[in-house]
Amino acid sequence: MGRVIRAQRKGAGSVFRAHTKKRKGEPKLRHLDYAERHGYLKGVVKQIIHDPGRGAPLAVVNFRDPYRFRLSKQLFIAAEGMYTGQFVYCGRRAQLQIGNVLPIGLMPEGTIVCNLEEKTGDRGKLARTSGNYASVIAHNPDTKRTRVKLPSGAKKVLPSANRAMIGIVAGGGRIDKPILKAGRAYHKYKVKRNCWPKVRGVAMNPVEHPHGGGNHQHIGKASTVKRGTPPGRKVGLIAARRTGRIRGGKGDEKFKEKEKK
């Protein structure tokens, strides 16, 4: 084994610390209080802003504090169709309009929502990426649970008291535009994380990576490794159940169609 490899130098394990420099703030729903549980609050969208490192724009919404004579500023993930000067209503008595926040149990089946709470009062955890949305499928009034279809296609049963914003997250189609230049990729990943550019192991020297070296770029041995492999050797396909192309599936059918063409 040669030098300390890249996977060892990272050293933080599975703990991810988000880059917060230049960020505008953490966009969340309002704290769940008495006003939202029994009525509604009215807010005004003051500004639509860009948050570095985030694909979706943010909406700066000013609410009048229900308990004190002051305004409270809140950052929301902007839904598609929101605009400056729009009135936003939060609470169980709010109307079904884009940008409004209300419990999913009060929404009709088929409603498109975003920034959905996973647990009641957690201020939004699901369907927050640009262009993403979840849809309300069915309600069970006996158990006070609601069935929701998530952006991944998975169906999840959540408490009907969980809140969500009506609409689709703005910024959809962002990944359709090609990056084209390495300079753009540099600026993109600089604010998101520090893993770019990522050099392939086979392009390194043998002291820098287990896959490095050779007269041409090849791994030279099986790329699968055990789960308990020591850190300097634990690269490649870790504890793989199987390798190679999946035959007989959707991917294989697409490959055969390309061959025919």
Curated annotation (Swiss-Prot):
Region entry Disordered, spans: 208-233
PANTHER family according to UniProt: LARGE RIBOSOMAL SUBUNIT PROTEIN UL2, RIBOSOMAL PROTEIN L2
Organism from which the protein derives: Anopheles gambiae
Disulfides per UniProt: none
Lineage, uppermost ranks: Eukaryota, Metazoa, Ecdysozoa, Arthropoda, Hexapoda
Protein location: Cytoplasm
Family annotation (PROSITE patterns): RIBOSOMAL_L2 (PS00467)
GO cellular component assignments: cytosolic large ribosomal subunit
Cleaved signal peptide residues: none
Entry's Gene Ontology molecular function annotations: RNA binding; rRNA binding; structural constituent of ribosome
Any coiled-coil regions, as ranges: none
One Pfam family of this chain: Ribosomal_L2_C
Keyword terms: Cytoplasm, Ribonucleoprotein, Ribosomal protein, RNA-binding, rRNA-binding
Stated name of the protein: Large ribosomal subunit protein uL2
One GO process term, biological-process aspect: cytoplasmic translation
Main location: cytoplasm
Family according to the record: Belongs to the universal ribosomal protein uL2 family.
Keyword Secreted: no
